[in-house]
Amino acid sequence: MASQPKSFEEQLAKLQEIVTKLQQGNVSLNDSIELFKEGMTLSNDLKGQLNEAETTLAQMMDENGQLHPAEEKGDDVSNNGVQNQGYKSQFLDGDVF
């Protein structure tokens, strides 16, 4: 079996190609089984990618469908889960130099 295409669109096109071959019915039983396995793997990978995209979009939107602004530096997200402890850089004051 060849390596799977990388992009979502390439994987989807390959899955559509497999489905078409299986629907045509002119494939041997053994080849059908292999195509089915490959198709299921692609289907699961695609479903995972869609779930990740949906989660990402849901995290960016509030309950009213409004887009959240990008996270600012110093928040818990950009610090790997560590909250900003109130540190203020001396370079932000402007009167260092």
Swiss-Prot record:
GO biological process: DNA catabolic process
Localization per Swiss-Prot or TrEMBL: Cytoplasm
EC number: 3.1.11.6
Catalytic activity: Exonucleolytic cleavage in either 5'- to 3'- or 3'- to 5'-direction to yield nucleoside 5'-phosphates
Record keywords: Cytoplasm, Exonuclease, Hydrolase, Nuclease
GO cellular component: cytosol; exodeoxyribonuclease VII complex
Homology family: Belongs to the XseB family.
Descriptive protein name: Exodeoxyribonuclease 7 small subunit
Organism: Limosilactobacillus fermentum (strain NBRC 3956 / LMG 18251) (Lactobacillus fermentum)
Gene: xseB
